[in-house]
Every structure is written in structure tokens, then in C-alpha cells.
UniProtKB/Swiss-Prot annotation:
GO terms for molecular function: phosphatidate cytidylyltransferase activity. Belongs to the CDS family. It comes from the Bacteria. GO terms for biological process: CDP-diacylglycerol biosynthetic process. It is a multi-pass membrane protein. Pathway: Phospholipid metabolism; CDP-diacylglycerol biosynthesis; CDP-diacylglycerol from sn-glycerol 3-phosphate: step 3/3. The gene is cdsA. GO terms for cellular component: plasma membrane. The chain crosses the membrane at residues 6-26, 51-71, 73-93, 97-117, 157-177, 195-215, 218-238, 273-293. It is an enzyme of class 2 (transferase). It is found in: Cell membrane. Its main location: membrane. Keywords: Cell membrane, Lipid biosynthesis, Lipid metabolism, Membrane, Nucleotidyltransferase, Phospholipid biosynthesis, Phospholipid metabolism, Transferase, Transmembrane, Transmembrane helix. This is Phosphatidate cytidylyltransferase.
Amino acid sequence: MPTQRIISAVIGIALAFSLLILGGWYFSAAIALVIYLGLREYFQMVRAKGIAPAAKTTMVLSLMLLLSATVTPHLTDAFFPLTGALICFYLLFQPKMATIADISTSLLGLFYGGYLPSYWVRLRLGDGAVNPMGLHLPLNGFWPESWAHPENFPTGLLVTILAFACIWAADIGAYIMGKWLGRTRLSDISPKKTVEGSLWGVGGSLLVGVLGAWYLQWPYWEITGALLGLLIGIVSLLGDLTESMMKRDAGVKDSGQLIPGHGGILDRTDSYVFTAPLVYYFVVLLLPVLNNL
């Protein structure tokens, strides 16, 4: 792995982990920056196809969805169709009549680049309970008083760390084992991905999921942890392939050049987009049911 790529990865993980721990508006601001930069790259690819989306309007409304996820998370799902309607209304009154492609790419940008990432904020927020075992900073920030007792960290933080760890395990496992053992191409969409590497990546995510469920004392932790790890491994891979499909259609190798050795923001966050709602509803809907059995 090139030195530049390693340095970028280490810096990125350190920043992401620090902001993840801080939570509150610090984490929301970080996600807002990712949404803004990611949508810029997305709309550059869209324009490369000769399409004229409502880029600025979609960016603003995507950030408003994130604001809702931070302040009123229970209303974010209700705001989503309203913001979609506003995009349609905006395009309706433009001097040049909008095409189906203009409308659909704008709505996809809202969904892919704004609504889905907002689930990371909701997941990190957790149940919103105040945890006394840490320093409570301005802007709803949190910092542990002691690193020796992570069991006292906010539940939302622990679950989000677990989700990140599963994604990292899947990415690292697929990259290393794919380089070593990869023989069978997985898909023409992403020629460098192999079946062998992907299976090892999913296996790494599954293992981390089981360990995390055991640590968090989830009900039936062997099953719930394996299921979550398996789903994250698969969905993060599908997220990667989805972004690769968009890049191939736009005729570009990378979504951008922002991160040395890695490409653009979308190239680094594609595995996270679909994972956030998966983990959120797994924790919010499935675990409470199992707790009552």
C-alpha cells in the first residue's frame, strides 16, 4: 500500500474517531462537511452526462435534513418527502424546462447524499440520555473522563463505533486478502474487486460484529452480532459498487482528488452511505423485540 495512501488513511481515521467521540454538533458539522463535499463530487459526475440538476437547492435541503436529524431526529423522515417536493417545485419554475434526468438525479442526490448520511447523526445520538461518566462540552459535546471504562460511554457512541469497526474490518479484509488470494473478478463494475477478497471482508465484518455484540451484551449476542456483521459487510460492499457504477457511467476513475492516494470524498465514504440506516433500524427495531423475548 503506497505511503501516501497509508498517511491519508491514518489521519482520516484519527479525525473521524475524534469527532465521533465528541458527538453533538461537532459530529454533525463533520457529517455536514462530508455531505457538502460529497454532493459537489456527485453533481460534477451528473453534469458530465449533460444533465442540469438542482445542485445548490439539493445541497441546502440536504443540510437542512441533517439539521433536523440533530435537533428533531423524530421528524427527519417526515421532512424527507417535503424536501423532495421542494426540489421538484424549484425545477418546475426554471426558465428551461427540466428533464426527467434533471429531476431524478436531483432527488437521488437528496436521498444518497443527504437523507441516508443523516442516519449517522441519529445513530450517534442514540436515546439522547445524558451520561454522567464523562465531560459534557459546549454544543452537546462529550469526552470520556476515563478510557478505562468504555462501558460507561453513551450507547449511541458504542453502537456507532461498532458500525465503523465492521466497515473498517470489511474494507481492510477485502483489500489485503483480495491482493493476496484474489483470483475471481466480482463484477465488471469494479474490476479490481474479487470474490475471494469480498468474502474475507464480509467475514471480518461478521467477526467484529460478534465481538461487539458480546461486549455490548446484546440479547442472543452470537446471532445478533453475526447478523449485523454479515449485513454490514454485504451492504458496505454494495455501497462501494453503487458508487463505482455511477463513476463508470460518468466516465471517471475517481469521484474527485481531494484525499491523496484515495480519490474523492465519495470514494472513501461509499461504504458508509447505506450502512447507517441499516444499523439504525437494526438497533431501534430488532434489538428491542429480542429483548422482550
